[in-house]
Amino acid sequence: KLGRFECFITSDLPIGAGISSSAALSCGFSKGLNELFDLGLSDLELIKISHAAEHDFVGIKCGVMDQFAVIMGKIKKLLILNCETLNYKLIDADFKAFKIVLLNTNVSHNLASSEYNIRRQECNMALSIIQNQYNEYKFLADVPEKIIFSLKKNFKKNIYHRALFVSRENKRTLKAAELIQRGKIEEFGNLMYHTHRELSKYYEVSCKELDFLVDFTKNISNVIGSRMMGGLSLIHISEPTRLAEI
């Protein structure tokens, strides 16, 4: 169904900064072809096609969250996604007087040669160990912390840390959505710091530059939260008066 076409791509998204520039490219390209050649593909089909491009052709065993956010995201909304069922809902992104600030650390990042696929393998190993005794769990994110604690002696240290992080982070995500909907933005900011600490300590995907910058924000009054985002960028929640210091 595809005919000939010429394509020129321009973007102000930094490449390799971990803010889903590749998902933006693949999804934008898919939507463009869908319109140009009147392919009649649904948004969900475009998400799956764009995901397959990264998963099967590029070789990044990524989830579908980035592609889903690019295509289904709305202005001033946050998206809560169940990656198992692809059920989702949009909630209001009302951060009151606070601003969201993204910071590019300019540290080089190449996901294809990074630890991403290794972490995927480690999480699968953790789940396999758990399923030997608790086969009712299909996904690591669903496993309660107490079960992971009880099986600690069965894990290598790094695998134990990966399992613990995934279980806790899933709970933090649900709690974060609840806090935002209740307008508890300061408490949400606290969760961001908790997440970054465990991304660094237990999931081991941070770096010294990111850790330094997150710790530095704790000394800036009215910056209420900071964490790494995606690859090597940071996301902060701050009062507008502190943006220059960040």
Predicted regions and their residues:
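C-terminal nucleotide
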Residues: 77-225, 242
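Active-site nucleophile and cofactor-binding loops and adjacent substrate-binding regions
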Residues: 19-21, 227-232
